[in-house]
Structure formats: C-alpha cells, structure tokens
Amino acid sequence: MKLVKKQKENVTVILLESTLGLEENIKMLLAHEYTHWIREKEIKHDIFEMCIGERFITEGIACSFSEEIVPNKQTSYYTIVPNTTVEWVENNIETIDKVVETELDKNNMMYDFFYMFAKTRIPNMPVRTGYVYGYLKVKEYMRKNNLKIKDIVKLDWREVLNR
C-alpha cells in the first residue's frame, strides 16, 4: 500500500500479494485504503506527512473501518502488527500520550511511530505502534460519542484527540 504522486495526481498502489489471495484480507485492505482516499480528498492536505496527530487519526480511522467491514478479528489484524505490539500500546498508552502531547502538530516523530525499522525514542517501544495508538484513540472517541466511521472520516484530527 503506497500513495504515489503522479503528475500532481495521487495514485494509491495496493500490493495484493500481501493478502494471500484471501477475500477477507482484500476487503480489509481495500477498506483501509478507501478511508485514506476519502479523507485526503475531503480534507485537502497531506494526511500522511502533515503532522503526527493527523497521521494517528488517519490510520486509526482506516483500521477501524477495516474492522467494520471484516468484523470479529483481533486488533492486531486491523493494525497489521503483532499481538505483542497491541499489548505494549495498551499497557503504555499514558506514556505515549505524554511523549506526543507537544508533538502532535509536528511531523518529526513520524518515523518513530509508523516505520518498520524505526529507532524509537520511547524505551522498548515496538515499531509501527502509531497504527495501534491511532486505532485505540479513534475507537475511544467513537464509543464516547456514539459515532461510526462515516461520522468521523472527515473530522479534524484535533477534535478526536481533544486538541
């Protein structure tokens, strides 16, 4: 899954071999990418690199919509990380909250939270935790406000993170 700029037009490239040809994996992946397409189209800024707050919520929305389309899987399935990463984020969410509190409107921690081979600043933090953190924040916001993805897909990230 990669967003590529081609002559001022965004093109999403989806590598279907990563789905192992399984219909539910394809549905999950397409649902995830669809929310990215809708969000970027409606918000009209770079949802991936503008700032870490935007990226958390963008990925959280995408993972949550995947869950709506392919229900009853573990969080690790939607966030595409090992179960141990999900557990680490759940056990350390307050630490993450404190670390990112003053960084949400910047993009200098993007690598720490979203890339496979990151050298993270939080001790023992697994890579790609941003997907889980965003997912948990989006799920919490939707639960508290009795909302669905369709209600928040265009919402400003600051609203979801109470900024």
What role is predicted for each listed range?
Residues 95-163:
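Pan-zinc metallopeptidase signature
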Residues 28-41, 59, 63:
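Active-site recognition of the HExxH zinc-binding catalytic motif
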Residues 45-47:
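Membrane-interface helix caps and helix-loop-helix hairpins in membrane proteins
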Residues 50-87, 91:
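Post-HExxH zinc-binding segment in Zn-dependent metallohydrolases
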Residues 35, 39-43, 66-74, 138, ...:
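Hydrophobic/aromatic-lined pockets within catalytic cores
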